[in-house]
Amino acid sequence: MKRRTIEITAELIEEEEGGYTVYCPELDIYTQGEDVEDALANLREAAQLHIEEVGPQNLKLRKVERQELTLEVHA
């Protein structure tokens, strides 16, 4: 069976009450973990389960473009 490698983005958000939420925009999946390592491991597992569910041949990655914006905030 042919294998391919894909790259996905992990956006980590530190939660006020503790732990981390992590989002993968290419696959549109969220998960969480107690620390960064745990959150990333959970994302890897969730991504692999998602790919198995849809089937590698049917996998469609959303195109993600990142741009940083600077905003002026008046206090």
Predicted regions and their residues:
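A short, exposed loop/beta-hairpin motif centered on an aromatic-Gly-Thr core
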Residues: L27-E37
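Flexible, active-site-adjacent loop/turn segments at secondary-structure boundaries
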Residues: P25-D28, Q57-L59
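Short amphipathic alpha-helical segments
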Residues: T21, E37-L40
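Structural detector for hydrophobic anchor residues on beta-strands
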Residues: I8, Y20, I29-T31
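Short, charged, surface-exposed hinge/linker loops at domain edges
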Residues: M1-T9, I13, A41-A75
